[in-house]
Amino acid sequence: KQYSMKKSIIIMVLMAFTNIAIAKTLVTLQQLQGKWQCTEDIYKVNTETWTFKKASFIVENKYVYRDKVDTSKYEIFYYLSKGVPNVYDGSKVGKIGSGTHIIYYAKRRKKILSYEIVSLKGDTLTLSQFAPRAIGRNAGIVTITLKRVSR
């Protein structure tokens, strides 16, 4: 009886992982384009806006640090892919019409990174990314939910 219980638990865990792995959404460049705002309020006065263009997306942050409002803005060149490639191909930037992953190259870290497109329902875009261990955070999957502000 105990053996079958362990077996059942293992099967349920495997099924859950399989469902998570399959939960990718195919989107087009046109569907992504526009301005999106992060719905998670990580800091009390944090505003994170993502603006997708055909070949790049711009992330703008407004936050409070030591009682002072600060901002940051950076542009990331990307392409869509139906999986995470082993090698970054800059010639695909802005040219692939659809995909399940947003692929970009992190120059400082000298490595290819990606966001998995978990879902796009109406004006809500959900992305996930594996985040490495950092100060105050263990390694793991981070989910980002964005609401469309404008097209």
Set out the residue ranges of the language-model regions.
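Positively charged n-region of N-terminal signal peptides that target proteins for export
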Residues: K1-S8
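N-terminal helix-cap/turn-to-beta initiation motif at the start of protein domains
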Residues: I22-Q37, S150
